[in-house]
């Protein structure tokens, strides 16, 4: 059984060459060592972090080095936070406490009682985002809203019963973690030339939703072997739709592709109409391009990272994503 990710429709014009410089990862890694997030002897932890952060130039191919470092801190924080909670093995009350303590850090800018090393890193990251925001407190608040919304979306899908697809997409568009990326892009690319009414415009909200859902559908396909091995298949639509609908993996994948392609068409439709609503098009177009780069970056990066690589994957591209770190990051079924 060999499926191909080429069945997803990704517009060619969205494909922008990413920055060919991963030196920012070392800076992020050194900060993680300095804050006792990782131990220097932890080769697997280093490999997991490295391959997670290589997505940053794909998501943000046009940013400065300092912005790339901040994006690296975001991805590092996402994997630290999500890996603890995105499992059926942690009790809900314990997960809720972690979420509430993290929300306090983002809202108040202070540490909770007896903070963990990860919580100390969360505060450091939050303050770095505030610093990057400069005088754009509105964009910092938008980032906070998107990020807090995400952390509260993790537990609802951390269950053992397959959800209805509509309910899954409603929660998954938050749960997949794209909204914090969008929030950071708003800090990077928003300026005084963008009409602030944009961020309350229903079309902007629909564009963000489409970006998140398309990325989630890509993610569930490329991470299929990794998540099934990690007993997280119940939250993977490629897995649970087969079980729920008694369909083959081929037919299930076809359905997911059709869903993704539908949302991309919806994105293009809303983009065109949104650009026609505003006078100063170029700054807005730059911001909207950043949403495309998230979808496009996830698609192409996923085929070349050890984070998902597995000979057991049903997808040819993931089977062939060979890396020296494949032995450390074992996704075999």
Swiss-Prot record:
Reactions catalysed, as given in the entry: (2E,6E)-farnesyl diphosphate = (E)-beta-farnesene + diphosphate; (2E,6E)-farnesyl diphosphate = (1S,2S,4R)-beta-elemene + diphosphate
Keywords assigned by UniProt, alphabetized: Lyase, Metal-binding
Motif placement: DDxx(x)D/E motif: 82-87
Enzyme class per UniProt: lyase
Molecular-function annotations in GO: metal ion binding; terpene synthase activity
Enzyme Commission identifier(s): 4.2.3.-, 4.2.3.47
Keyword check for Lyase: yes
Motif (NDxxSxxxD/E motif): 219-227
GO biological process: terpene biosynthetic process
Pfam families found in the cross-reference section: Terpene_syn_C_2
Cross-referenced InterPro entries: Isoprenoid_synthase_dom_sf (IPR008949), Terpene_cyclase-like_2 (IPR034686)
Statement: the UniProt record of this protein carries the keyword Repeat: no
Domain description: Contains several highly conserved motifs that are important for catalytic activity including the aspartate-rich 'DDxx(x)D/E' motif and the 'NDxxSxxxD/E' motif, both of which are involved in complexing metal ions to coordinate the binding of the isoprenyl diphosphate substrate in the active site.
Function: Terpene synthase that converts its substrate farnesyl diphosphate (FPP) into the sesquiterpene (E)-beta-farnesene as major product. Is also able to convert FPP into delta-elemene, beta-elemene, (E)-beta-caryophyllene, 9-epi-(E)-caryophyllene, and a yet unidentified sesquiterpene.
Family: Belongs to the terpene synthase family.
Designated name of the protein: Terpene synthase 2
